Regions:
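Helical scaffold of the NTase/Pol beta-like nucleotidyltransferase catalytic core
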Residues: 1-40
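Metal-dependent nucleotidyltransferase catalytic core
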Residues: 22, 63-103
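Active-site nucleotide-donor binding segment shared across nucleotidyl transfer reactions
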Residues: 27-60, 69
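Short catalytic/ligand-binding loop motif for oxyanion handling, primarily in non-cytosolic enzymes
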Residues: 46-49, 71-73, 134-139
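Internal, conserved structured core segments that host functional sites
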Residues: 88-138
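Conserved, surface-exposed functional patches that form binding/active-site neighborhoods
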Residues: 119-172
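Low-complexity, serine/threonine/proline-enriched polar segments
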Residues: 174-182
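Conserved small/polar residues in nucleotide/adenosyl-binding loops
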Residues: 184-191
Length: 192
């Protein structure tokens, strides 16, 4: 499937319903443990505008303040290992993102943009930690730039040829950087 192709509507609906079951378990865990969360991105738009999923949306994005985020991951790791696996940089060396995914064990879902990922991907929900930012505008920009840089470098490290939603010279430059970062990372591991 290319980045411009869509799921077969029946397959997409089946995926959405399976993700909804994962989300219902998440809600129950949060309620039982007094943890707060919020929906954002396409997920929030879907709830407001469509009273469910956006018809073409294939994921559930959840934000949590850092303390609650860390607590819920710990709960999943300690109490729900029979049903779920936490995918993040702490548990999977090759996980390419700084957020976490809670995946249902025994399922498989690999979106096109992750076709080259070397990490188990299942039917999941995506959790994003929200951290405090400095009051000072200059420090805030520095923090934002740092987070952007390191998160993109992590992605480049794991995807030699990531799916790029750009064209022309920008695509060529970013592709060359991806190959260079991936190669450098590979060489570093070979010499260990």
């Amino acid at each position: 499937m290319s980045q411009n192709e869509q799921y077969d509507p029946k397959v997409l609906r089946k995926l959405q319903l399976a993700e909804l079951e994962v989300f219902k378990d998440f809600i129950k865990i949060c309620d039982e443990n007094g943890l707060s969360y919020f929906l954002f991105a396409g997920c929030a738009i879907g709830v407001e505008r469509h009273k469910g999923f956006i018809p073409w949306d294939d994921d559930i994005d959840i934000g949590m303040l850092r303390d609650d985020y860390e607590k819920v991951l710990k709960i999943y790791r300690e109490k729900y290992t029979d049903k779920y696996v936490v995918l993040d940089i702490d548990s999977q060396e090759t996980f390419p993102f700084y957020n976490a995914e809670i995946a249902r064990i025994g399922t498989k879902n690999i979106p096109y943009v992750f076709k080259d990922a070397k990490v188990p991907m299942g039917i999941d929900i995506a959790l994003y930690p929200y951290d405090n930012v400095p009051d000072d505008a200059k420090k805030r920009r520095r923090q934002r730039s740092s987070v952007f840089f390191w998160s993109k470098l992590r992605i480049l490290r794991e995807f030699k040829k990531p799916v790029l939603f750009m064209h022309g010279w920008k695509r060529k430059v970013v592709s060359a950087m991806c190959i260079a970062v991936s190669y450098t990372h590979l060489r570093a591991h070979e010499t260990e």
